[in-house]
Every structure is written in C-alpha cells, then in structure tokens.
C-alpha cells in the first residue's frame, strides 16, 4: 500500500471498553477531531442510553456525526457512509484526518474497507408492515430469505432486520450478495480496546446509566415518539420502557440490561476478531501504547 496515502486511525472495541475516554485523550494529544461510528449516537435525544459524549466533552474535542436525525428518521448504512465520506474528504483536503471511534462493526467496515452497501432507499410503508408483524416473525422471514444476514443480525435487532428484508424485497437478492467493496483512499490503523475486566465494567456502566436518568430519558422519548419505535427496543431503552410500563422493576431492568449488554459485547468481540485486524492495546494505561503505534504509522 503506498505510503503516500493519508493515515486513518480507528479506535474500536466492545461496548464499555473505554473508547470514549481514550478517544478524548488521543484527540487532545494529536489535535484531531472524532468521527462517531456508533449507530445509536447518530440520533437526537438518545444521550444517556448510548453513553454519548457529554456536551462538555464535545466542546473539548470536535465530534462529527452525532445528533444527525430524530429517532423516528432511520439512517441507513449507505446514508451514514455518504455523510462520513463527505467529512473525511473535507478533512483530507485540510490534511487533518479525524479518527473513527465506535463499536458498530458494519459502519466501521464501510469506512475502513470501502464497503459498498446496496443503494436501496428506505421504504416507510414496508417498514410499517414489518413492524406490525413483530420482530420475531421478521427475523424468521429473514432466516428464510437471507440465512447469512440472519446469522449476523441479532434476533432483537429490529432496525437491521428490517433493512435486510427491505433490500431483499426491493431487489429480489439477499443483502449479503450485494455488498461489494472498493479500496478507500487512505491507509488504516485500527487500535482495539478489550479490557480483561469488561464484564465488571459493563455492570458498573449499566448501573450508572440508570443513575444518570435512563428511565427518564426513555419516558421522554416514548412521549415524543411511538413506544413501538425500533430504537426504543434496543439495549437499555427496551428494559427502561418495561419499567415505565410496570413490567419490570428497576433492579430487574438493570440486571436484564447488563445481561443483554454482555451478550452484545460478545458478538462485537467476535465481529472485530473476524472482520478487523486491530492492534489490541494491552494494560491499564493504553494511551502511551496507542500514541507509539500512531507515531509509527505516520512515518
């Protein structure tokens, strides 16, 4: 790969691994901005449940692709990729590339590997019909139509399930047969975080999310939008919604959120090890190791 290509740094890892903290430290040291690659942080008002960087943190370091749309306006992978590539192209001209931070594997791959998602626009009427069928039925439909996609998408992930079905019904072909790739105009250095005490960190963060007002945020979102909104069924929000509906108490919700998050982190680990090849940062103080790897990559 030509050394003349600019270096794009990606910081990846499972949820609660410490990406936000390290990203802020790296951004301040290197005087770079951050490009968000967390699919839920794209949405306005979903702050507590996604552990979105605080307003103070966003003032310290410029963040791109946060708060793009309302939660009832889904963003496809293709739309995310187009928005991200516009920012990257501008920063490339300025010779000040941001670095990618997030745990949404497919979104990362779209930027680091030049993944080309199918150009199928959202179809609100179809999504409404699929929503009426229920997520369990939708995932069964996907298993029949595109078994490969179904094996990669969690049974509870309504947004990605509907998107995969949308592509199948619009084109007559599985989404997994239509995702090509083309080399991006940059070199990529992937740094991975996967601390040994991740389970403990997940438990602590989940408790903190509820202390920070996850139930209150969910109640506000459910009043502003339909409580059947797919994003309100995702980890954390789904359990908080059940507290509001009287189906769970707070302690049960925390326990269930913790368990679902641990299961999600396991899937993230599997994805990153199969689809990416990061330098896994070791030790309790990854900043110095990350800086050394970045400086070596810039040479």
Swiss-Prot record:
An annotated Gene Ontology molecular function: ATP binding
UniProt keyword annotation of tRNA processing present: yes
Function: Catalyzes the transfer of a dimethylallyl group onto the adenine at position 37 in tRNAs that read codons beginning with uridine, leading to the formation of N6-(dimethylallyl)adenosine (i(6)A).
The family this protein is said to belong to: Belongs to the IPP transferase family.
EC category: transferase
Cross-referenced NCBIfam families: miaA
Presence of the UniProt keyword Nucleotide-binding in the record: yes
Chain positions recorded as ATP binding sites: 13-20
GO biological process per UniProt: tRNA modification
Superkingdom field: Bacteria
Protein EC: 2.5.1.75
Pfam family, one: IPPT
Site-annotated residues for Interaction with substrate tRNA: 104
Organism name: Prochlorococcus marinus (strain MIT 9303)
Residues noted as binding substrate in the record, renumbered to the chain: 15-20
Record text on subunit structure and interactions: Monomer.
Cofactor(s) essential for the protein: Mg(2+)
Protein keywords: ATP-binding, Magnesium, Nucleotide-binding, Transferase, tRNA processing
Record protein name field: tRNA dimethylallyltransferase
Region described as Interaction with substrate tRNA: spans on this chain: 38-41
Catalytic activity: adenosine(37) in tRNA + dimethylallyl diphosphate = N(6)-dimethylallyladenosine(37) in tRNA + diphosphate
